[in-house]
A protein has these predicted regions:
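Active-site neighborhoods and metal-handling regions in enzymes and metal-associated proteins
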Residues: 1-394
């Protein structure tokens, strides 16, 4: 189990919830360990996890067409309700292996008409027909929400996506292990991309090499911003046929997904000498991130972390440096809490995993960015990174 269930239960008690329902792709996967594929590839498909209070078993609600995913994923929740029609036949002349036996068992279970019918059935069996239920509002369609409220009129449904965010903010040891591996694979992809750096190589060719390394190491590409020269100042630069020239800066703002968990990091390199201004400005944004390591610890106000990082970059060489945020949490979603901004009311807690970043974009010049994945430890910070933060000269 990856989910921080003790934290979930504590927050449910605090918020007065008799049950909570996960509905969006990230929360369904996080809470159950089940990856409902259709949720991740298009909008609209419904999958839920019902998590009742003490004394009741949780339930996964999923479309019949996804039942074949259950044996390989082995979710920790054993009660799986299916809805919708899907035809699959069984060769009764052979002995089914364990995976096929489980599929046969699941396909032999009751098929509810739709996702809401399955959810309502599970709730009624557990006696959840009144009280207060938190529902993650980000994945359920308005039509399904209307049906759910009509079927259970005595329940007060309260939006609780923010509760799931608060739960996910504190990582379990297994989550931290996966995030560390995701970081290592992504760093390897940056190295792989830079291994082909020479005059004439295009941004697009570098991205292909980056993505290939991710895939070769069982990770999936998610973000691949790689820009050369003045194109590096494009905030969300998408690789083009721009060819690398001597003196060009190369900016990476990249990430992947490994076992459903995200990586997100930034590094800079240059083919030959990029010039004094780039060296000076890059050193400033690097020192901003390094200053974060000096002060990160449980209890630190996130707003204070923001202010100190910005002030460091300003002091170290970019006096006009300004940002809306200098990082964010990361986990099964690329932007878990906290958002490292001046307006944040959060404080750092042990076993948060955050991305600390100091991007600087100047059109006509360059984009400079350092971003590290960092775990908040009992008394400080632990980098999940192995690549040096300094500007790499090729």
């Amino acid at each position: 189990m990856l989910a921080n269930v003790p934290r979930l239960k504590a927050l449910m008690r605090k918020d007065g919830f008799d049950a909570v329902i996960a509905t969006c792709a990230e929360n369904v996967t996080y809470l159950s360990g089940f990856w409902a594929m259709s949720q991740w590839v298009r909008r609209g498909p419904q999958a839920y996890v019902l998590f009742p209070g003490e004394g009741h078993e949780p339930t996964i609600i999923v479309n019949s067409s996804l039942l074949d995913l259950v044996p390989d994923q082995n979710p920790w929740i054993s009660d799986i309700r299916r809805y919708g029609y899907f035809q699959i036949d069984t060769d009764r002349s052979v002995q089914l292996d364990a995976a096929d036996q489980l599929q046969h068992q699941l396909f032999s279970s009751k098929a509810y008409k739709n996702s809401v019918d399955a959810l309502v059935g599970a709730m009624k069996e557990r006696g959840i027909e009144r009280g207060t239920v938190g529902i993650d509002e980000m994945g359920i369609t308005p039509q399904c929400m209307d049906q759910l409220q009509a079927a259970l009129p005595d329940i007060k449904f309260v939006r609780c996506f923010s509760l799931f965010e608060r739960v996910r903010a504190i990582k379990t040891p297994r989550e931290i292990e996966i995030l560390r591996h995701a970081a290592r694979v992504t760093e390897g992809a940056i190295d792989a991309a830079l291994s082909i750096a020479k005059e004439g190589v295009t941004e697009r060719e570098m991205l292909r090499r980056f993505n290939a390394h991710l895939v070769e190491n069982d990770a999936a590409p998610v973000v691949g911003c790689i820009g050369f020269g003045n194109r590096s100042a494009m905030i969300n630069v998408q690789p083009s046929d721009r060819k690398l020239k001597n003196g060009d800066l190369i900016r990476f703002d990249v990430g992947g997904r490994y076992r459903h968990y995200r990586s997100d990091m930034s590094r800079g390199a240059a083919l030959g000498d990029p010039g004094e201004k780039i060296r000076k400005y890059y050193a400033a944004v690097e020192k901003g991130v390094l200053r974060g390591y000096d002060i990160i610890k449980p209890g630190l106000r996130v707003a204070d972390l923001f202010k100190e990082i910005v002030a460091t970059v300003q002091r170290e060489g970019i006096p006009h440096f300004a940002r809306s945020h200098v990082g964010h949490g990361i986990g099964v979603d690329g932007y878990d809490p906290p958002n490292i901004a001046a307006s944040s009311v959060d404080v750092l807690e042990e076993d948060m995993v955050i991305c600390v970043e100091t991007p600087y974009y100047e059109l006509g010049f360059a984009g400079l960015q350092v971003e590290d994945m960092v775990r908040v430890t009992k008394d400080g910070a632990e980098s999940l990174m192995s690549l040096p933060t300094g500007l790499r000269i090729l």
